[in-house]
């Protein structure tokens, strides 16, 4: 477990799949469509976000490996977050993403943790900035969601920056 001031990140268990599905009414993600297959995949790491004030699970963070060349040392983590609607806008997501980046740097050898979000998702972009991530740029037409292609913004934090 990784504990912050507002939230704690704990191990994801099979009973948490319902939590993931319930947090998905969000136009900027499509987790609900892939919960059964993707969240059982060993290649995706995941932790549940628990609000410290009441001990209630309020969402999850996940990560998967991305590579920037054939050298294994060029691997990085791409992270994602999903919160139940009533937990949004309170700083909980910013802290959870910062804690996840710190956890990944402490437990793996990567030099880079990145996140991407829809160019229109101002709330998540603000959360990433508050978590210590740096905006890098736009990937045009990079994500297929809701029957069309969307541009995404890439944010990152390097080892030693968070």
List PLM regions with ranges.
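Acyl-donor (CoA/ACP) binding surface of acyl/acetyltransferases
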Residues: 1-28, 46-162
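Short, conserved clusters of charged catalytic residues that mark active-site
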Residues: 31
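Short, basic/aromatic recognition patches
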Residues: 34-36
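Short loop/turn motifs at secondary-structure junctions and domain boundaries
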Residues: 38-43, 133
């Amino acid at each position: 477990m990784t504990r912050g001031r507002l939230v704690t990140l704990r191990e994801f268990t099979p009973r948490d799949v319902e939590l993931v599905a319930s947090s998905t009414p969000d136009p900027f993600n499509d987790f609900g469509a892939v919960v059964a297959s993707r969240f059982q995949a060993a290649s995706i790491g995941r932790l549940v976000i628990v609000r410290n004030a009441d001990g209630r699970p309020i969402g999850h963070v996940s990560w998967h490996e991305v590579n920037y060349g054939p050298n294994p040392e060029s691997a990085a983590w791409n992270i994602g977050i999903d919160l139940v609607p009533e937990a949004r806008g309170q700083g909980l997501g910013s802290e959870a993403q910062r804690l996840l980046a710190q956890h990944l740097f402490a437990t793996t050898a990567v030099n880079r943790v990145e996140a991407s979000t829809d160019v229109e998702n101002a709330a998540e972009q603000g959360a990433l900035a508050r978590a210590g991530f740096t905006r890098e740029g736009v990937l045009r037409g990079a994500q297929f969601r809701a029957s069309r292609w969307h541009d995404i913004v890439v944010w990152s934090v390097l080892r030693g920056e968070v």
